UniProtKB/Swiss-Prot annotation:
One of its GO terms (biological process) is mitochondrial electron transport, ubiquinol to cytochrome c. The gene is MT-CYB. The keyword Cell wall biogenesis/degradation does not apply. It comes from Hemiechinus auritus (Long-eared hedgehog). This is Cytochrome b. Heme 1 (or BL or b562) is low-potential and absorbs at about 562 nm, and heme 2 (or BH or b566) is high-potential and absorbs at about 566 nm. Heme b b566 binds at H97, H196.
Amino acid sequence: MLNIRKNHSLMKIINNSFIDLPTPSNISSWWNFGSLLGLCLITQIITGLFLAMHYTSDTLTAFSSVTHICRDVNYGWLIRYLHANGASMFFMCLFLHIGRGIYYGSYLFKETWNMGIILLITTMATAFMGYVLPWGQMSFWGATVITNLLSAIPYIGTDLVQWIWGSFSVDKATLTRFFAFHFILPFMIVALTMVHLLFLHETGSNNPTGIISESDKIPFHPYYTMKDILGMISLLLILMTLTLFSPDLLGDPDNYTPANPLNTPPHIKPEWYFLFAYAILRSIPNKLGGVLALLMSILILFFMPLLHTSKQRSMIFRPLSQCTFWLLTSDLLILTWIGSQPVEDPYIIIGQLASILYFLIILFLMPVMGLIENSMFKW
């Protein structure tokens, strides 16, 4: 009798991706975040679908519809807060996943890495548009400030902004199209994730040592399925704890005030996961310069494979590179903190120094440390 798992057209793909997939025997818990991101994505799509059933994308009723979801819909409050905090968990896993990739040299799988950055950008766009939908003060002013950045583009900037707005200001047309894009983009993310996995399975997974592990592979199931399930349970536990005990911990109180174009909040800021990029944007006094720095803060990741100078792949045996990596991590935490602070001294100068250091570490310090370590390995 034929084994359906190995011979059926559809089951064969699933089998080769999640069951019989040859996996390095020594990958640590840092490799769990890929599956956790998958779980976050599924959770977001399901909760988002139920929210979309009750939400209305109209400036007059959007805020009221979110209130209605929380008050009148059965477990609407739970679905809404799972969706909001699920986004935070999504980005936490994303940042840890990218950090793992940098530390262990996974970026040398160029196609997988580039696909991952495209996924990051798409996810950031989706999250930004989702933040606009409740139509609170921070939603409205966040949308106004961020979309207005496009006006820094020479010649076509103003026309481009009005084209995105669908009006002469952030209004009903903007909210409707943001809702449409926020609904469709997660399905694009699912498709891009499949391409990401396709490229990954072409090369096989990296491992902590960065050494080729062709001779030491084990099947993905049951070893890593069990390990992933443990990670998933832990993630869901953290998410449920956050949602049930402190649902507004990571949100902004200003978003509980309905959007008012005549009243600007004292301090406009995005969600915590965008604060590092927002701090880099604000650190440059010139508008176009700030926008370019903001773009480069993400696009610089595309250059990681080109900036790799070390003869070793992973940082596990490279103490100098480890120091620069943790310096980068600390710098990103400082930028995140600065992004949440008002634009006044000493925050301005700290933000400028942290922004310079961010680019300096990636473009200069990391490649130089790789070269120094290469010379140190010569006996």
